[in-house]
Every structure is written in structure tokens, then in C-alpha cells.
Amino acid sequence: MRLLTSRATRVPSPSGLLCAVLAMLLLTPSGPLASASPIEAAEAAVVRELRCMCLTTTPGIHPKMISDLQVIPAGPQCSKAEVIATLKNGKEVCLDPKAPLIKKIVQKMLDSGKKKN
């Protein structure tokens, strides 16, 4: 004896429905959308990822090329300190925090910040 006729539709089982929902969630992008407003994009840039920002470092750069310097101490996101310089042309470059020239540049920027306050 057959319970389903050929015209009857089958309802997916709960496990099949669960798999479909999980697949949809995995395929949905989790990052900010390209249509985000500039303010939302700036807020998203403030949030740091939980990994090292610098994969490669540059041992030296002329200090006059640097417009801004960011020092990120070692922490749970990365086991080493990172120095990121924003150049006057807008590029960001990772600098080697152990290089003597970079240590001097960081110290000079820290000293100039203390004099302004």
C-alpha cells in the first residue's frame, strides 16, 4: 500500500532543512558589503582582525616619506609588535620594529608627541 500519490509533494525532513539553512549561512558573505556608506566603512576599518597585520616587513624607509606611524603592541591577535607607517602617497608599509633605523624613527615620533602635550 502506497501512502503518497504521484502528485503529492514531499516536505523536507528537519535534518535536510537544517543542512539547507547551514549551507545558506556558509555562502552568505560575512564582511561589510560594497554598498556600505563611507561612515560604515570607516567604522569597519577601526576594528582590527584577530591576526597579524604585517606578513612582511621593510627594514628601512626615509622618515620624510612617513605621514603617520602606528605601533601595535604584541597581544592575543599577534605575538609580535607591529609598526605600520602610512606614507605621504597614502600607501601603508609594515616596518621591522627590531631594525635600528625604525627604533630611532619610533622614538623620535614619541618624543615629538610628548613635546606637543
From Swiss-Prot:
<feature type="disulfide bond">
    <location>
        <begin position="54"/>
        <end position="94"/>
    </location>
</feature>
<dbReference type="GO" id="GO:0061844">
    <property type="term" value="P:antimicrobial humoral immune response mediated by antimicrobial peptide"/>
</dbReference>
<dbReference type="InterPro" id="IPR001811">
    <property type="entry name" value="Chemokine_IL8-like_dom"/>
</dbReference>
<dbReference type="GO" id="GO:0045236">
    <property type="term" value="F:CXCR chemokine receptor binding"/>
</dbReference>
<keyword id="KW-0395">Inflammatory response</keyword>
<dbReference type="InterPro" id="IPR001089">
    <property type="entry name" value="Chemokine_CXC"/>
</dbReference>
<keyword id="KW-0732">Signal</keyword>
<dbReference type="GO" id="GO:0005615">
    <property type="term" value="C:extracellular space"/>
</dbReference>
<dbReference type="GO" id="GO:0008009">
    <property type="term" value="F:chemokine activity"/>
</dbReference>
<dbReference type="GO" id="GO:0006954">
    <property type="term" value="P:inflammatory response"/>
</dbReference>
<protein>
    <recommendedName>
        <fullName>Alveolar macrophage chemotactic factor 2</fullName>
    </recommendedName>
</protein>
<keyword id="KW-0202">Cytokine</keyword>
<dbReference type="InterPro" id="IPR018048">
    <property type="entry name" value="Chemokine_CXC_CS"/>
</dbReference>
<dbReference type="GO" id="GO:0042119">
    <property type="term" value="P:neutrophil activation"/>
</dbReference>
<dbReference type="InterPro" id="IPR033899">
    <property type="entry name" value="CXC_Chemokine_domain"/>
</dbReference>
<feature type="signal peptide">
    <location>
        <begin position="1"/>
        <end position="36"/>
    </location>
</feature>
<dbReference type="GO" id="GO:0071222">
    <property type="term" value="P:cellular response to lipopolysaccharide"/>
</dbReference>
<dbReference type="InterPro" id="IPR039809">
    <property type="entry name" value="Chemokine_b/g/d"/>
</dbReference>
<comment type="similarity">
    <text>Belongs to the intercrine alpha (chemokine CxC) family.</text>
</comment>
<dbReference type="Pfam" id="PF00048">
    <property type="entry name" value="IL8"/>
</dbReference>
<keyword id="KW-0964">Secreted</keyword>
<keyword id="KW-0145">Chemotaxis</keyword>
<keyword id="KW-1015">Disulfide bond</keyword>
<feature type="disulfide bond">
    <location>
        <begin position="52"/>
        <end position="78"/>
    </location>
</feature>
<dbReference type="GO" id="GO:0030593">
    <property type="term" value="P:neutrophil chemotaxis"/>
</dbReference>
<comment type="function">
    <text>Has chemotactic activity for porcine, and in a lesser extent, for human neutrophils.</text>
</comment>
<dbReference type="InterPro" id="IPR036048">
    <property type="entry name" value="Interleukin_8-like_sf"/>
</dbReference>
